[in-house]
Amino acid sequence: MKRHDKMPALSLLILAGGKSSRMKKDKSQLPWQDSTTLTHMLTNSYVYPFEHTVISANRIIEPQEIPDFIRQSSIQDGHTTEYIRNRGLDTERHLAIVSDRYSDCGPLGGMEAAMRLYPSDRWLILAVDLPFFDFSRVPALLAADASEYDAVIPVVDGRENPLAALYKGRVYEKIRTALAADDYRVRKIYNKKAVFIDETPYARQYLNMNTPIAYKEALACVTNQNRPVPVVSITAETSGTGKTHLITQVIKELSAQGYRVGYVKSTHHMSTGPKRNSDTDLATRAGAVCTALIPDGPKKSRAIEDAAFSMSVDLVLIESRRHGLFPKLLVLPPEAGAAEGDNETVALVTRRKDTNSVYFNTLHVDNISALVKYIKLLANL
């Protein structure tokens, strides 16, 4: 995205002070692309000339969490830290870190602290757990604004995103009133005075990471984004789960949608060439345009990776018990209602309707359309 040097004055607030109760760890410190979610968002934010950039955080933000190109000089004043960067011919850029005056009040506490200390006509309010927000949609949000509105709220698939939205500075008084009444709903401050903009075509920008599952799915998306070709592995801890049949159904559906699918099969048998009704033959007949059979060997995982990345396709599906690449879908045996999986497993594929997990998404083996939709999400298709 190019810098927007002549856009209307606008300040940025990054909300990094939440309890992260569902994530069970501080979302602002989650590893993301060789840094953290907070550092990544700060780095991306400098494509836009914000009047003020403020981080709301109820912890100490270490200097190393601030990108090097921002961290040039700092001033500390009580619960506020300011970083000032002079861009040579550019204007100065200010980054401030503030803590809430009103504790345990959710996002409104951070909004009150920022708006009180740094008055601004407009604010872009962002939760820190939006790893794909690259600020390219800021001009569209500004274009939808009008004097009578207090907020511009993006809507994705019918769902409002008030923590990735544009607010007028005048909502500060509404925030104070809401806090005084112990009403901490963000919607309270823009209800009936907002314009809603459909951002469904840009849904990835608003994908947030509220849970361990969402974080793992986001990691899968960015991992595949950086690969020569996206990969999804379908695995099973035992035989007899029906994973090969499942894969052929997935290949058939993806092929019908116009995608070129590759298939890599990990096996402990020696390869003897093409064979009727073999797994690779079934994959080919289902629509796979490339297949590879990888036998056991000292560098099997590398061989699987090389085979997958050499295929000129839209997506590669890997079938394996132990050597698949991240992200993995684990197919459960018919009687199983749960599984431990591993750090690379993002979802369980089950025949039971009572399978639930806080660590993995769950998909039903007979719902091929939902399974294909999920695979496309992980593969950025």
Predicted regions and their residues:
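Glycine-rich phosphate-binding loop used to anchor ATP phosphates in small-molecule kinases
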Residues: 296-334
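Short, charged/polar "capping" segments at the starts of alpha-helices
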Residues: 60-69, 271-274, 336-340, 353-358
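N-terminal phosphate/diphosphate-binding loop that engages ATP/GTP or pyrophosphate donors
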Residues: 249-299
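Glycine-rich phosphate-binding P-loop
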Residues: 232-255
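Phosphate/Mg2+-binding loops and adjacent switch elements
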Residues: 318-381
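Extreme N-terminal, non-catalytic leader segments
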Residues: 203, 214-233
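A charged, well-structured terminal subsegment
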Residues: 177-213, 368-381
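Nucleotide and nucleotide-moiety/phosphate-recognizing core
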Residues: 5-161, 166-170, 176-183, 192-205, ...
